[in-house]
Structures are given as structure tokens and as C-alpha cells.
Swiss-Prot record:
This is Pre-mRNA-splicing factor CWC22. Its main location: cytoplasm. Residues 606-626 have a biased composition (Basic and acidic residues). It comes from Candida albicans (strain SC5314 / ATCC MYA-2876) (Yeast). It is found in: Cytoplasm; Nucleus. InterPro entries: ARM-type_fold (IPR016024), CWC22_splicing_factor (IPR050781), Initiation_fac_eIF4g_MI (IPR003891), MIF4G-like_typ-3 (IPR003890).
Length: 648
């Protein structure tokens, strides 16, 4: 036999040397600066495409530093830069998060140093990021609370007037957004401004000895803001036309507060040699292909970013998946859920899988297709189906649903829609699946991610409107809520919240009832007693005892019934100012009014805290005038602090 020798050749990839990397760094720095200087509303889409050609992960420090410098130089471009960041953040959230961290740190530093220009620049940029839903509104509410505190560190008229001036600027920038998303907190802020206006008038009348005097400019500005609020900020748009370029389901919102420990990562601003330069470049090339939907044979002009096309300029074409594609997609979602080690990993993989599906459909159809909502609904539905097929319920699925809902309103509305769908067809499921579904949705309700006023508004707990399967589902939902929250918290949320009562009267019929509703009340009482939750029926029993039979109703009975109705209505009205909506913080989205508070509004936010307030928000004008020690102001600040804690 002949001996054969085999020689193996190993190919070593030579990494670019320091000189090459440094030259590339300098060129990229100049390129980023030039692109940002030439940015206009008309070329923002082309600029985004050019920026994505740059490795934004490698050069994120340069990019963020340059955009902050440009915004300081030209503060009027804040809306334009906010729109640009919103697009990039929807694809690379790390960049949006780093920018927010640096802006908050810049604000804190310059607020202590009283550097007015940098304070204004930071605040304006932060406000625009909130309007674009890159940043949650909790941060700006905390800043407003800090600015309007009665006990400022330096009780100086100039400092106080500067703080008020800054607060007015914030409300001009974000008032319309806060009116829509955090109405309860906004009302507190407006009430505080009214107190400041009254105290300032008294101080000026007393020659400055009665308190902090208001400058004429601030007095007029406060009156202007209050006038805007009375008109529901109707004439102020949240985002200018042409700059709302990211679809709701694609927005990434960061939750950052003043108390968070933040890092500016300044080392990203300076050059350093990358020992794995080519590997990192190849990783970004793959990411860029996902973002832009590139193929080897597509012309650059065909590379569009899905999120930067508005839905208002053309008619959308709806394209559904074929049956085979749908089955394959569902199978992939199932395998992804089953193979993940944690809920965080599962959500990350599912969203990445969903994004690839959108890019594939877009490339295939060559046109803008309305597949985003369809893909998201299929994904959410598969999470629910996977949960229902388990032998025993696992909170793993509940946390996946919780994290998806927390992303934005789009996902919240999808799960509300799916809950109503499964409630209507629940009789098709076996008992084991019923238990899993009940515990899954019970977890979402207990965690405050699904708004009860939207999910339960159509449920009627009567013998005619329910069947055994629906009642079993409701039983498991309530049992899961009791297990996670405790009976006292569930009672506080469901029974003692006057705002919620009109929306869940089909389950707890205690308002606007008469003798005709006696059977429905008895059925509900019997249901909750049978499942061991009789403590939730106390108010219903009281209502039932005070109802008079329709056929035996005389004048005295009618008078008593009307009196009870008026009493219940009055109680509900008076308690509204003490009870916030229990909708989730970025997350529950109930647009229904909370009733009259001290400041009249017509529309209310669906993003309010669902925890009841501890004290009445109404404060008499006379108390504000006579209380020179600022007790009312402190109470208002405490109320706002409680609300901010609940939002977090």
C-alpha cells in the first residue's frame, strides 16, 4: 500500500490594522456630521438610509454626540432629530437608550450648575423623544414635579421664576401628549400651576412679602397654558405632519426615571482598536439586510425602510399569508417558544422572527402590505394556543404575554381582541385548556397589563348570556387574580373603584339597576358565592336588598329607588377625584373620562395608574390663598409622587 499524505491548509483572515481602522473612524465621523447638517424634513428618509449604511453599532458614540451638538446649536430642529431617532430606535434600540441616558445626565449636571442653555436644550430634546414614544412620559412628569415643588433648594425669586419658565416650556412641548396618555398627572400639574398663579398674585399684591412673586412673563404663560388645557390642547399637534414616520407596532419605548443609575459610556466617543473588526462588520451587514430588506440583485433605490412610510398617503393593499406559509410560521413560533430558556429570551426571539417575516413579505410583494398587524396577531394567538395545550399552566406564558403587551398600544389592543375572541368560543375547549386560558388571562389582569374596562365591558354574567364553559373560564380568571394579588387588593380594584363600575356592571351589577335586574344580581351573587368569593358580593347584596319589585312599586318605593339611585350617582361622582383609572402605565390605554376633577377636561388618558389615590385631588381656592406654609402644595406634590410611583 502506498502511503498518502494529506496536507491541510488553514486560511487566516487578517484583521485591518490600526491605521486603517483609525482612518475609517475619521471618515465616518465627517460623514455623520455632514449628514446631520444637511438633514431636512424632505430628505429625512434618504438620510436614514445613508445612516444605516454606516455601522451605527460601532459608531453610536460618534452619532449620538454629533446629534446632541447639532441640537444644542439649533434647538428648533429638535422635532426633526426626534423623528430621526424614532426611526433608528425602532430598529436599533440601543442607540435610543444611550441618547436618553446622555440627555438625562446632561440635564442633571447643568440643572445643578444653573446652565440655562444646556438645560433648555436637554429638556426640548427629551420632550420630542416623549412625543415620538421613544421615551416614556414618567421622566418628564418627574421633572415637572421637581420644577414646581414649593420647597426649592434656593428660595430665590429668580430661581423659582426660571423653574416655572422651564415647566411652562415643557407643557408647551408635551401638553398635548400628556393630555392623551397621562391625563390624571397632567391635571395635578395644572392644579399646581393654578396655585402658583394665585400665590404669585397674592405675593405681588403684598409687595413680595407673602410668598414668591411671579414675573409678568410667567404669569401670562401660565394663563396661556391653562387656556390651552381648557380647550384640551386641540390646536397643538403632538407630532408635526411629515415627521410621524414610525408605525405604532414598531415603536420601542424606553422607561427611564430620574432615580435610575445611568451611564454615558463616553469611551464610545473615542477611537479604539477592534481586534474582531471583520466579525463585527459582518454582524452589522446581516443586521442591515434585515433592516433594509436588501438582496444581492436589488437596486439601492428599492431598499426602503418599512417603518418610514406613512399610511396616509396611499391606499394599503392587504395581503394574507397562504395556508402553507401560515402553518410554517405557526410551527416556527411554537418551536421558538418551546426552545427558549426564559420568557425574556422567548420574547426577543419571537419579535426578531416576526420582524424577519415582515421583511420577507415586503420583499416578496414589492409593495407596502398590511401584514404587520396580521403577523403580530398570529404571534399573539400562538402564544395563547401554546399555553392552552400545556398539561398544567406555566407562568412562563403569562410573562411572555405581559412583556408583549408592555411594548405599545398595538399589542395591548391585540390581546384585548383575542381575549374577547376566546371568551366567545371558549365552549370549544376542554377543561384543562379552560384552566390554562383562565390562569393566563387572570395573570394579565392581575399584572395590570390588560385594561379591565376594555376587556370586560361586554361580559354579562347571567344564565342567558353565559354557558358552563364561560363561567368556568371566569372562575379561573378570578382565582388566578386572587392568588397573585390577594382578596383585599382584588376587592379594592374591582369593587371600590367607582370609575370601573360602569364597565364591569355586567359582572358586578351595582349601578343603574332596578327591579328588573334582580335576577341578574342574584345570579352573580350565587356565582361568586359558589366559587368561594362571597366577599365580593357584599355591595351586590346591599343593592339587592334595596331594590323594590316592579309590580309592587308604589310612590314611596319609587321615591326610595330614585333616592338610592341619586345617592349612588353622587357617591360615584364624589369619589372619582379620589380614584385613578386602573389601566396600566404604558400600558393600559383606557380613553374613557375619569369624571370631573378640579380642572375640566373632555378626554382622558388611557395610560393612567390603576391604583386608587389616597386623598381627594380637589382643593379649595381659599385654602391655597390662606395657607402660607405651603401645606396644599406639599399635598399636591405627594399625590403626584404617588402617581409617578404607580406609573413606574
Amino acid at each position: 500500500m502506498e502511503n498518502s499524505t494529506t496536507t491541510t491548509t488553514t486560511t487566516t483572515v487578517t484583521q485591518p490594522d490600526e491605521s486603517y481602522q483609525r482612518t475609517k473612524w475619521i471618515e465616518t465621523k465627517k460623514n455623520i456630521k455632514q449628514l446631520l447638517q444637511q438633514l431636512t424634513p424632505s430628505n429625512i428618509k434618504q438620510t436614514v438610509l445613508q445612516l444605516f449604511q454606516i455601522n451605527l453599532l460601532r459608531y453610536q458614540g460618534l452619532f449620538i454626540r454629533e446629534i446632541m451638538k447639532q441640537q444644542i446649536r439649533i434647538t428648533t430642529n429638535a422635532e426633526l432629530y426626534g423623528s430621526l431617532i424614532s426611526i433608528i430606535n425602532s430598529k436599533i434600540p440601543e442607540i435610543g437608550e444611550l441618547l436618553i441616558n446622555r440627555l438625562v445626565l446632561q440635564f442633571k449636571k447643568n440643572y445643578l450648575q444653573n446652565n440655562k442653555n444646556l438645560i433648555n436644550s436637554s429638556i426640548i430634546f427629551i420632550c420630542q423623544l416623549i412625543n415620538q414614544q421613544v421615551l416614556n412620559e414618567i421622566l418628564i412628569l418627574q421633572i415637572l414635579q421637581m420644577l414646581l415643588e414649593s420647597n426649592v433648594p434656593n428660595n430665590n425669586n429668580n430661581n423659582n421664576n426660571n423653574n416655572i419658565e422651564l415647566a411652562i416650556m415643557v407643557l408647551k412641548q408635551t401638553g398635548s401628549y400628556l393630555f392623551k396618555h397621562s391625563n390624571t398627572a397632567l391635571i395635578m400639574i395644572l392644579n399646581r400651576l393654578k396655585d402658583i398663579l394665585q400665590d404669585g398674585a397674592n405675593a405681588n399684591a403684598n409687595g413680595g412679602n407673602g410668598g414668591v412673586g411671579l414675573s409678568s412673563w410667567n404669569r401670562k404663560s401660565i394663563e396661556y397654558i391653562l387656556k390651552l388645557a381648557r380647550n384640551d390642547f386641540k390646536n397643538i399637534s403632538i407630532i408635526k405632519n411629515g415627521l410621524d414616520l414610525v408605525e405604532t407596532e414598531d415603536k420601542e419605548t424606553h422607561v427611564i426615571t430620574l432615580e435610575d443609575k445611568l451611564y454615558s459610556r463616553d469611551h464610545l466617543n473615542v477611537f479604539s482598536v477592534d481586534e474582531e473588526y471583520l466579525d463585527h462588520e459582518n454582524e452589522y451587514i446581516e443586521l442591515k439586510k434585515e433592516i433594509l430588506g436588501e438582496t444581492d440583485h436589488e437596486d439601492e433605490n428599492e431598499n426602503e425602510i418599512q417603518v418610514i412610510e406613512t399610511t396616509k398617503n396611499y391606499e394599503e393593499k392587504i395581503t394574507d399569508m397562504s395556508q402553507s406559509e401560515l402553518l410554517q410560521y405557526q410551527k416556527t413560533v411554537y418551536l421558538t417558544i418551546m426552545s427558549s430558556m426564559s420568557s425574556d429570551e422567548a420574547v426577543h426571539k419571537l419579535l426578531k422572527l416576526n420582524f424577519k417575516s415582515k421583511i420577507k413579505n415586503k420583499t416578496k410583494n414589492k409593495t407596502k402590505t398590511k401584514t404587520n398587524s396580521n403577523d403580530n396577531e398570529i404571534l399573539a394567538d400562538m402564544v395563547i394556543k401554546c399555553c392552552s395545550q400545556e398539561k398544567t399552566y406555566s407562568k412562563y406564558y403569562g410573562i411572555i404575554g405581559e412583556k408583549l403587551i408592555s411594548r405599545n398600544d398595538h399589542w395591548h389592543n391585540l390581546f384585548i381582541k383575542l381575549f374577547k375572541y376566546y371568551y366567545d368560543i371558549i365552549e370549544n375547549f376542554e377543561t384543562n385548556s379552560l384552566r390554562n386560558l383562565g390562569k393566563f388571562f387572570g395573570h394579565l389582569f392581575a399584572s395590570d397589563k390588560l385594561a379591565l374596562d376594555q376587556a370586560w365591558s361586554n361580559i354579562k354574567l347571567t344564565e342567558q348570556d353565559t354557558n358552563p364553559a364561560k363561567r368556568i373560564l371566569l372562575k379561573f380568571i378570578f382565582q388566578e387574580m386572587i392568588e397573585e394579588l390577594g382578596i383585599n387588593e382584588v376587592k379594592e380594584r374591582l369593587i371600590n373603584d367607582d370609575y370601573l363600575k360602569p364597565y364591569i356592571k355586567g359582572i358586578f351589577p351595582v349601578i343603574n339597576v332596578d327591579g328588573k335586574d334582580a335576577d341578574a344580581i342574584r345570579f352573580s351573587i350565587n356565582f361568586f358565592t359558589a366559587i368561594g368569593l362571597g366577599v365580593l358580593t357584599e355591595e351586590m347584596r346591599y343593592v339587592l336588598d334595596n331594590l323594590s319589585e316592579p309590580e309592587e312599586e308604589d310612590d314611596r318605593g319609587r321615591s326610595r329607588s330614585r333616592s338610592y339611585s341619586r345617592s349612588a350617582s353622587s357617591s360615584s361622582y364624589n369619589s372619582r377625584s379620589r380614584s385613578y383609572s386602573r389601566s396600566q402605565s404604558r400600558s393600559s390605554r383606557s380613553p374613557n373620562p375619569r369624571g370631573r376633577q378640579r380642572f375640566k377636561t373632555k378626554k382622558h388618558n388611557h395610560n393612567e395608574s390603576r391604583t386608587p389615590s389616597r386623598e381627594n385631588l380637589k382643593r379649595k381656592r381659599s385654602e391655597s390663598v390662606t395657607d402660607r406654609n405651603g401645606n396644599n402644595n406639599n399635598n399636591n406634590n405627594n399625590n403626584l409622587q404617588d402617581l409617578l410611583n404607580n406609573l413606574k
